[in-house]
């Protein structure tokens, strides 16, 4: 009944991954991001992650597997997804939704910390404001974007961009794989500490 649609969806996902994988710059960016994160942890820094919608779930997933567990038993790593509902609703109401992440960074971010900002379009105003706030705090910035990087292109220390111009879910599928690889590489880097 739906077998052709299922095959088509899986083939499109595989094609998106193959295109991403064929660009060595993507592989190098993932490695650079993992080392940057591990270096922050080694000196007492933390990572703050944020996104909207499905990207918000990815930001939470990233923090959960750093503080909890990925594949190996190891110490938890300092990671916070900016996802406290009382904070999000307070700042949205009092300042505007575009400030929900930047306000949190103003409060708890510090030099030596890292921001992971996730936006499939690269145009999310509240993620752009988060990047700006992180810069003012002296933090390093990693972004996961899609398409052409949008307004976030060129704003990060490391940008990992999925060059897909269709639906956002294809970009998110690569983002979650990148997140898992980042955690795996961080675990390897932290063993060296």
UniProtKB/Swiss-Prot annotation:
GO cellular component, one term: cytoplasm
Keywords: Carbohydrate metabolism, Cytoplasm, Isomerase, Lipopolysaccharide biosynthesis, Metal-binding, Zinc
InterPro entries: GmhA/DiaA (IPR035461), Phosphoheptose_Isoase (IPR004515), SIS_dom (IPR001347), SIS_dom_sf (IPR046348), SIS_GmhA/DiaA_subfam (IPR050099)
Keyword Zinc carried by entry: yes
Record's subcellular location: Cytoplasm
Biological or metabolic pathway of the protein: Carbohydrate biosynthesis; D-glycero-D-manno-heptose 7-phosphate biosynthesis; D-glycero-alpha-D-manno-heptose 7-phosphate and D-glycero-beta-D-manno-heptose 7-phosphate from sedoheptulose 7-phosphate: step 1/1; Bacterial outer membrane biogenesis; LPS core biosynthesis
UniProt domain SIS: residue ranges: 37-193
Binding locations of substrate: 52-54, 65, 93-94, 119-121, 124, 172
Substrates-to-products reaction catalysed: 2 D-sedoheptulose 7-phosphate = D-glycero-alpha-D-manno-heptose 7-phosphate + D-glycero-beta-D-manno-heptose 7-phosphate
GO process terms (BP): D-glycero-D-manno-heptose 7-phosphate biosynthetic process; lipopolysaccharide core region biosynthetic process
One MF term in the entry's GO annotations: carbohydrate derivative binding
Subunit details: Homotetramer.
Protein name as annotated: Phosphoheptose isomerase
